[in-house]
Every structure is written in structure tokens, then in C-alpha cells.
């Protein structure tokens, strides 16, 4: 997810609104459980006392869970594709992702894909460090065809909370608001004043499978 997020960052995750039936929206950064096979060769780090306590009271995903963080690019019913040297296209509308993908990356030159129709109740996710991310593109052989069930989503990452000098919100990039994408506005996802009370500070270093490709490591 670099440069949007850096290794060691902690993010606040809105875990409240999914309880009321809200679903992930295009452009959001979400934390989700391993759908199965995405982190199969990753070993769990030993949780510290603070992490165990936060997990116990519900302010943080369980240390035993395998969680990932990616950006939602397409939702159920969408058609998404990306050809070599081209942009990511959702429902026929090209995304301008220069504002959030890693500098020097291309939208998908390392792994072109599609067109793919995302099943209802599932999402297609991609990392912002496109040439260094094991995302939906690399799991199309698994059940779900690389998509993630909405039921696996822990919540939306809304703020980089730590370290202090990196504090920043994580808004949805404007390119996902283009009329042609036909984004559905889910009012339940709007953060109420009390929503942050059930947010968890998720350390991005907990579960992170690294991809080795031509001498590069993944994040």
C-alpha cells in the first residue's frame, strides 16, 4: 500500500458501520481477513500484552487473525479490467490513479487482467504499490477468482494514527466519484461522531506476505 501507507504505520479502522449492514465502497482502504490462501506461508508474530488487551476488548483484530489491507477498486456487479500500458477500467470508466499509486508504478503492467465481473457480495482489491502487491490479480486461481467476500472485511481504514508525524486521513480518491462508474452512495458508511469509539489501531506490520519478483520484495 505504499506510499499511502508505510510499514509500521497504525491505522484506525471503522468497525462500527459494517455491523449495520454497510458494504465496502470503491476507493476505500479496507482491512480484511485472509480469504484463504493469500497468507498461507506467513507465520504469526507473537502478540504483545497491549495487543492482546486491545483484541480482548474489541479495539483491535485478534492477533491470531490473518489480516490484510488493500484498496477497493470494484464492488459486486462491477466489471473491471486493465490491459498492459492501459489504465484500470471500472464499468467502462478509466481510473486516474496517479494521485495514490506508488511513484513510478504503472496501473497493472506487471499483471494485466480482465475483464472480470465481480460477484455480488464481493470486492476486487488492489494495493497502491502495484508492482509490489499480492492483491486480487494474483489470486484468481482461488475460490472467488481473486475477489474477497464482504463478510471477510473487518472495516474501513480511515486514519493513519501512528506515528504522530504521519497522521493523515484516508479519503476516497476523486477518480472513484466519476459519474460513469455509477458508484452507489451508502449513507451508512458516513462516519458518525461515535464511530471512532469502536475503531481499532491496526499495525500494518502484523500480517504481510511479501512477494519476491525479479529481485523485488512486496508490500
Identify the role of each PLM range.
Residues 3, 7-219:
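Soluble "head" domains of membrane/secretory-pathway proteins
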Amino acid at each position: 500500500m505504499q506510499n499511502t501507507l508505510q510499514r509500521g504505520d497504525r491505522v484506525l479502522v471503522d468497525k462500527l458501520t459494517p455491523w449495520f449492514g454497510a458494504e465496502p465502497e470503491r476507493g476505500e482502504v479496507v482491512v480484511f481477513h485472509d480469504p484463504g490462501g493469500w497468507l498461507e506461508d506467513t507465520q504469526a508474530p507473537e502478540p504483545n500484552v497491549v495487543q492482546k488487551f486491545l483484541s480482548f476488548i474489541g479495539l483491535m483484530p485478534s492477533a491470531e487473525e490473518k489480516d490484510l489491507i488493500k484498496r477497493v477498486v470494484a464492488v459486486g456487479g462491477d466489471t473491471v479490467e486493465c490491459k498492459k500500458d492501459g489504465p484500470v477500467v471500472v464499468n467502462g470508466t478509466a481510473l486516474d490513479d496517479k494521485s495514490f499509486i506508488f511513484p513510478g508504478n504503472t496501473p497493472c503492467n506487471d499483471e494485466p487482467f480482465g475483464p472480470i465481473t465481480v460477484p455480488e457480495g464481493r470486492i476486487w482489491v488492489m494495493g497502491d504499490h502495484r508492482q509490489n502487491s499480492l492483491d486480487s490479480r494474483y489470486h484468481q486461481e482461488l475460490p472467488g477468482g481473486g475477489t474477497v467476500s464482504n463478510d471477510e472485511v473487518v472495516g474501513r481504514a480511515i486514519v493513519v494514527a501512528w506515528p504522530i508525524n504521519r497522521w493523515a486521513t484516508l479519503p476516497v480518491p476523486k477518480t472513484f466519484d466519476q459519474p460513469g462508474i455509477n458508484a452507489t452512495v451508502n449513507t451508512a458508511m458516513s462516519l458518525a461522531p461515535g464511530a471512532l469509539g469502536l475503531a481499532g489501531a491496526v499495525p500494518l506490520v502484523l500480517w504481510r506476505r511479501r512477494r519476491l519478483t525479479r529481485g523485488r520484495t512486496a508490500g
